[in-house]
């Protein structure tokens, strides 16, 4: 397992958790079918990004720059600036979510944990190698399984859950359609495209024959290229399946607890974790908070966010696994 698993886990960021929690709290299981709808779409899109990197040895951002003419490049430049700004705001929100999650676990003040998380992330990105960062991501993806445990603990009517999962239910009203768009938007996020492509390139650089320029499949032996293609396809499939299982679990958990007790307005993932306590117990609430902290601290956008800003902008010139002296543009971004 590699980029696919990490990318899938990074999709379940605090904003995504809050959106799924709101979907479950406001409409119960009515939006659960979106987990089934988005699953093949995520697999297809992320596999395209992954295959592009494998076939060309080039990142998605660099390919876009090469593909478009001068006018297109200008538009792309504006979009990349907007991406960096959006990611900076997302980093701030994610770090605040770290504090909220740890505070719910009675681990200390939220502002202190936000500072600690920011410091650790910065240190790891500056000092650590990409191999160490990727290993931490893969190892700590398991913390997101907390949401699956919560869903199992609070759900009693699995027949109803399965029915809502496979049979779409659509309400033609403004709030439902707005939440539907929010769920689809937070599940299939554009930064995942860059993350998948760039993570694959970094992994290719770590290979013995990789070096500073990743070797595309066309320059490798047919047998090796075929094995790598099969492995990457499985990696993406497992990663996107894992991501949607977490989405499924969050919607089910909040539907079975908050919605059934007429709590329908959830503004943040931390609020959802706190609201679960009276109905699901302290253990389930703590697991939900643990999942929130994991979504921020480990395999989610709060760590990749600085990198995911850098990769589209500097993918042709730098990489996390390069020597520190060779990648000042990355650190600047």
Per-region residue spans from a language model:
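Membrane-interface "cap" regions at the ends of multi-pass membrane proteins
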Residues: 1-15, 74, 203-210, 226-231, ...
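Juxtamembrane transmembrane-helix boundary signature
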Residues: 6-7, 34-67, 79-85, 89
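Flexible loop linkers connecting adjacent transmembrane helices
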Residues: 19-22, 47-72, 100-102, 208-210, ...
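Extracellular/periplasmic helix-exit of transmembrane alpha-helices
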Residues: 41-55, 198-206, 221-223, 241-271
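Hydrophobic transmembrane alpha-helices that form the core helical bundles
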Residues: 55, 74-107, 114, 118, ...
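Loop-to-transmembrane helix boundary motifs in multi-pass membrane proteins
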Residues: 72-73, 110-115, 283, 287, ...
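Transmembrane alpha-helical segments of multi-pass small-molecule transport proteins
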Residues: 77-80, 105-127, 143-147, 152, ...
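Hydrophobic alpha-helical segments and their helix-loop junctions in multi-pass secondary transporters
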Residues: 142-169, 183-200
């Amino acid at each position: 397992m590699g980029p696919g698993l990490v990318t899938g886990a990074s999709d379940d960021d605090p904003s995504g958790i809050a959106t799924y929690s709101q979907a479950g709290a406001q409409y119960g299981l009515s939006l659960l079918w979106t987990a089934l709808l988005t699953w093949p779409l995520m697999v297809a899109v992320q596999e395209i990004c992954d295959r592009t990197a494998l076939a060309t040895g080039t990142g998605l951002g660099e390919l876009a720059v090469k593909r478009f003419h001068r006018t297109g490049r200008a538009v792309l430049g504006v979009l990349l600036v907007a991406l960096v700004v959006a990611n900076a705001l997302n980093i701030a929100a994610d770090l605040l979510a770290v504090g909220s999650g740890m505070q719910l676990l009675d681990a200390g003040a939220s502002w202190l944990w936000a500072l600690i998380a920011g410091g650790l992330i910065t240190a790891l990105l500056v000092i650590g190698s990409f191999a160490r960062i990727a290993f931490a991501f893969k190892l700590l993806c398991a913390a997101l399984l907390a949401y699956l445990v919560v869903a199992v603990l609070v759900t009693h009517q699995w027949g109803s859950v399965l029915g809502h999962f496979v049979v779409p239910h659509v309400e033609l009203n403004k709030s439902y359609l707005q939440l539907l768009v929010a769920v689809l938007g937070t599940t299939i996020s554009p930064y995942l495209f860059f993350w998948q492509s760039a993570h694959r390139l970094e992994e290719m650089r770590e290979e013995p024959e990789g070096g500073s320029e990743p070797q595309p499949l066309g320059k490798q032996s047919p047998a090796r290229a075929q094995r790598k293609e099969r492995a990457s396809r499985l990696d993406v499939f497992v990663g996107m399946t894992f991501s949607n299982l977490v989405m499924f679990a969050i919607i089910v958990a909040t539907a079975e607890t908050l919605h059934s007790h007429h709590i329908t307005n959830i503004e943040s993932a931390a609020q959802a974790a706190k609201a679960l306590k009276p109905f699901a117990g302290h253990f389930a609430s703590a697991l939900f908070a643990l999942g929130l902290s994991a979504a921020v601290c480990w395999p989610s956008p709060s760590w990749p966010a600085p990198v995911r800003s850098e990769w589209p902008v500097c993918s042709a010139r730098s990489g996390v696994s390069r020597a520190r002296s060779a990648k000042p543009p990355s650190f600047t971004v």
